[in-house]
Design a protein with these regions (language model features):
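Bacterial N-terminal signal peptides
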Residues: 7-18
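N-terminal secretory signal peptides that target proteins for export/translocation
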Residues: 1-2
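Sequence/structural signature of beta-propeller domains
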Residues: 23-323
């Protein structure tokens, strides 16, 4: 009987060791979409288990495609909305949001966000909202929608900052945005994480995670795996998916501690070493009850500890049996 208990314990130990890597980031994704340029926006569709992608080229400005978790083309969505510079996609409450927010010349008196009313493919009607910055035109490439439905825009260029919409924006007029914090330089995309209280932001060389209440940086990690601009969560919201070329999407873990970010060797003021966001006014006040994902490292450490304890236990049990 004692040998049976020992065998069972060893089996549990073996299961823990083999199960631990399951928390690791899944394999990278290859986008198999003909004529797709380098994506500027990607959003995880948590309802249907797919990703929406747009490349921001002339044709891409009126086309968004979906791909499965195998990278294969699914739905091609067209709509007739006039746009200026589509730069971002976001997903919230079973709706896709398209950020027409680019303004490299800083000449637009307002930006717009579109939301197709159907995601079944083909042509679609859309909803649209117009927004203006309180301090003049800005170029932006990043948009994220909070669990409360507030839209956040992260500008780039001189004095990069984070702005958000007021609750229930009008669809018949131009809505004034609120500046909530300074932002890291050169942000190209952003997404809310599963708990709804953190925003992940991507730059040319790093991933930053900020608390959406205090606007303090709570995680930062270097990321230099190729080029690319777009970022979203994976379909489990446990990791991040970052585009690194027209066809490649690389998985990265969500930073949980602040690393020193290496400076990008460029003369552009948009892409200098990142700065920490600083709080301004009115952070989003909604907090999701979703559980935060457990990291791979924690799973491995737990398995190792279990293995050590099991080894000691088996050794002591064996000694008792021999005595």
């Amino acid at each position: 009987e004692r040998r049976s208990w020992t065998a069972a314990l060893c089996c549990c130990m073996g299961w823990a060791l083999t199960a631990a890597p399951a928390g690791a980031a899944p394999a990278s994704l290859t986008l198999d979409v003909p004529d797709l340029g380098e994506p500027v926006g990607i959003a995880a569709d948590l309802s249907e288990g797919r990703y929406w992608v747009t490349d921001g080229t002339t044709s891409g400005r009126t086309t968004v495609v979906s791909v499965g978790d195998d990278g294969k083309l699914g739905t091609k969505l067209n709509w007739q909305a006039p746009t200026t510079d589509v730069q971002a996609l976001s997903w919230y409450d079973e709706h896709l949001y398209v950020g027409d927010i680019g303004d490299s010349a800083r000449r637009r008196d307002h930006i717009q966000v579109l939301s197709p009313m159907s995601l079944n493919g083909g042509s679609a009607s859309w909803m649209a909202w117009d927004f203006s910055y309180p301090d003049g035109p800005h170029d932006a490439a990043a948009m994220a929608v909070s669990p409360r439905g507030n839209m956040y825009f992260i500008t780039r260029g001189d004095k990069p900052a984070i702005y958000r919409t007021r609750s229930n924006p009008s669809r018949t007029g131009v809505n004034a945005l609120i500046k909530v914090a300074d932002a890291p330089a050169g942000v190209t995309d952003a997404t809310f994480l599963a708990d709804g209280s953190r925003i992940a932001m991507r730059t040319d060389n790093a991933i930053h995670v900020v608390d959406a209440y205090s606007w303090h940086t709570i995680g930062a990690a270097n990321f230099t795996d190729g080029g690319g601009e777009a970022m979203t969560t994976d379909l489990r919201q446990a990791n991040l998916e970052l585009t690194t070329s027209a066809t490649k999407v690389t998985t990265a873990q969500i930073p949980s501690k602040v690393e020193k970010i290496a400076a990008v060797p460029t003369a552009s003021s948009d892409h200098t070493a990142s700065q920490k966001p600083t709080a301004a006014t009115e952070p989003d006040s909604s907090r999701s009850t979703s559980k935060r994902p457990v990291g791979t490292v924690a799973a491995i450490i737990g398995a190792v500890v279990l293995a050590v304890v099991a080894g000691v236990f088996v050794g002591l049990w064996g000694r008792r049996e021999d005595a």
